[in-house]
From Swiss-Prot:
GO molecular function annotations of the record: argininosuccinate lyase activity
Keyword Amino-acid biosynthesis: yes
Protein's name according to its UniProt entry: Argininosuccinate lyase
Name of encoding gene: argH
Family designation: Belongs to the lyase 1 family. Argininosuccinate lyase subfamily.
Organism classification: Bacteria, Pseudomonadati, Pseudomonadota, Gammaproteobacteria, Pseudomonadales
InterPro entries linked to this entry: Arg_succ_lyase_C, Argininosuccinate_lyase, Fumarase/histidase_N, Fumarate_lyase_CS, Fumarate_lyase_fam, Fumarate_lyase_N, L-Aspartase-like
GO biological process, one term: arginine biosynthetic process via ornithine
Length: 464
């Protein structure tokens, strides 16, 4: 069975219809139909411009615009029939427009190609998606600031190599994720700036012979600038790759955060409690409360990384200008945007609801000689070289391992066997509070600095 070639806008050159399987294989309407709002937006701007330069009459423009608005309403009401034989979102909408308003509908495509049309649609769509994602990042960051302020004095162990390193505050830890998300936000803002160049008017690849006004169309569609080269305009997908790169970094951050949450909820850590609404159980083990949300976010990072690699591979061998390969740009881009937005939404809902277990985190911070560096710094202030202090404290830690005593649990006599510079005042620096309070500088873990960082973060978010 084959399709009727008269269904195709380009059928005039062909002597036989496209094979039915090939029609399905080459069609993109099953996934690019989500561009319909932006396709209609671009078409309305294009028709408005064509009327201004005299290619369309004002009456024709109005008929086209009314028809397109009606089609959008049909789509949003679920009354639009998407046809695979019409290939894509563009031809489906154009065919329906012609059905509704007659021959005037066939004039809409004057001065443009699907090549610059789809390049415009994707940029418009991604611009809106980035705005939604930025709002979710901000919402998540607000939740992190809530936790950081609430838990600015809550002490927990800080880790390197997943081994106890130094005491930090839970609030300070939350602010580390705030910083990462700020960089993610900035990358996406930069990506949005670069993608906001209008390719419409590039036509198939060389521009058009019609007296188009690209500056008008650019203004109507909210682009910052008109693209400077028609070949590049229809073939450029850097913006999609850049978005997937920024999305991959953001998902990497969320994946790392997820790993910590999974660890912290485990019976081996028990640092935090996740509300039941963010967890699931087991079909066989009645006791289980599984942290599915962070686990899924951790797993979904691979989808976004794959989208980035897929787009890089897609583009690496293409000559100028447009090639059918580019039809494959949409599904990975769509999936990357959906995955990042949904992951951010899940985290933005979950993070403010986390309940730290203060006593357990404090007890964990008391294990592992987390104030060893503080003892070394104490000896430095007594006039000893740091490397000598490092050696001295190393011996003290070895003694603690052998005797089962933390540094703060040793007597002054025991500590002085490693250095006669140690006096009674050493115990003030060996406490958890003494350790975190001593890091009282910008970027440090002292509660005072955590609260100051929260204030700066709130000011940053208020300025967006």
């Amino acid at each position: 069975m084959s399709t009727d070639k008269t269904n195709q806008s380009w059928g005039g050159r062909f002597s036989e219809p496209v094979d039915a399987f090939v029609a399905r294989f080459t069609a993109s309407v099953t996934f690019d139909q989500r561009l319909y709002r932006h396709d209609i937006m671009g078409s309305i701007a294009h028709a408005t411009m064509l009327a201004k330069v005299g290619v369309l009459t004002d009456a024709e423009r109005d008929t086209i615009v009314d028809g397109l608005n009606t089609i959008q309403a049909e789509i949003e009401a679920g009354n639009f029939e998407w046809r695979v034989d019409l290939e894509d979102v563009h031809m489906n909408i154009e065919a329906r427009l012609t059905d509704r308003i007659g021959i005037t509908g066939k004039k809409l495509h004057t001065g443009r190609s699907r090549n610059d049309q789809v390049a415009t649609d994707i940029r418009l769509w991604l611009r809106d998606e980035i705005d939604l994602i930025l709002s979710e990042i901000t919402r998540l960051q607000k939740g992190l600031l809530v936790q950081a302020e609430r838990e600015s004095d809550t002490i927990m162990p800080g880790f390197t190599h997943l081994q106890t390193a130094q005491p930090v505050t839970f609030g300070h830890h939350m602010l580390a994720w705030f910083e990462m998300l700020s960089r993610d936000y900035e990358r996406l803002v930069d990506c949005r700036k670069r993608l906001n160049r209008m390719p419409l008017g590039s036509a198939a690849l060389a521009g058009t012979t019609y007296p188009i006004d690209r500056e008008l169309t650019c203004k109507l569609l909210g682009f910052d600038v008109v693209g400077g080269n028609s070949l590049d305009g229809v073939s450029d997908r850097d913006f999609a790759i850049e978005f997937c790169s920024a999305a991959s970094i953001a998902m990497m951050h969320l994946s790392r955060f997820s790993e910590e949450l999974v660890l912290w909820t485990s019976a081996q850590f028990q640092f935090i409690d996740l509300p039941d609404r963010f967890c699931t159980g087991s079909s066989i083990m009645p006791q289980k409360k599984n942290p599915d949300v962070p686990e899924l976010v951790r797993g979904k990072s691979g989808r976004v990384f794959g989208a980035l690699m897929g787009l890089l591979t897609l583009m690496k061998g293409q000559p100028l200008a447009y090639n059918k390969d580019n039809q494959e740009d949409k599904e990975p881009l769509f999936d990357a945007a959906d995955t990042l937005r949904d992951s951010l939404r899940a985290f933005a809902d979950m993070i403010p609801a986390i309940k730290p277990r203060h006593a357990i985190m404090r007890e964990a911070a008391l294990r592992g000689f987390s104030t060893a560096t503080d003892l070394a710094d104490y000896l430095v202030r007594r006039g000893l070289p740091f490397r000598d202090c490092h050696e001295i404290v190393g011996h003290a830690v070895k003694y603690g391992v052998e005797t089962g005593k933390d540094l703060a649990e040793m007597s002054l006599e025991e500590l002085r066997q490693f250095s006669n510079q140690i006096e009674q005042d050493v115990f003030a620096v060996l406490t958890l509070e003494g350790s975190v309070n001593a890091r009282n500088h910008v970027g440090g873990t002292a509660p005072e600095q955590v609260r100051a960082a929260v204030a700066r973060g709130q000011e940053l978010l208020a300025g967006r």
